[in-house]
Amino acid sequence: MASKLSSLEVTIMAMGEYQFILFPTGNIPSISEDGIEFVGDNKYNFHHAVEVLQMSPHIKNDPTSKSWKTFDDECYFLYFDGKYKVEIELNSGSISEEADDISIRTKIYRDEGNVIEALRICQVLCDSLNLKCWDIKLRKIIDLDNVSNVAATIDQYSKLRNKS
């Protein structure tokens, strides 16, 4: 079984946003002309992810950030500390006991964007749910415990932000 995001979905989501896809450890990312697919049978517990998010400071369920009206409201969360925003989408917008992915997005060209907060949320979820982190812009898995990996992501975000 695989979680798959088409090139169009990634392009639509990623325009003006810095995005991370979290996926279960043991699954393998596979890039093709059709997009990225996370191949493997491993899943994470959807309800445990919701609990982790609900216990995190400044994170609330926020269905106003969902991509499509047909997606489930319970899948959308927003980090907002009064200044910065990070959108969180569980399981591509569908409730399921066993889930495939988590999308973490923050704005690049607006002051409300903050990649450091996005990375912090990625770290909490990866540690709590045994997930890996795919950086959409760098097109690779980043080790959130590796200073040079995190620095490369922050550098890429800064380069994109400075283009505006």
Where do the language-model regions lie?
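Acidic (Asp/Glu-rich) sequence patches and key acidic residues
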Residues: 5-164
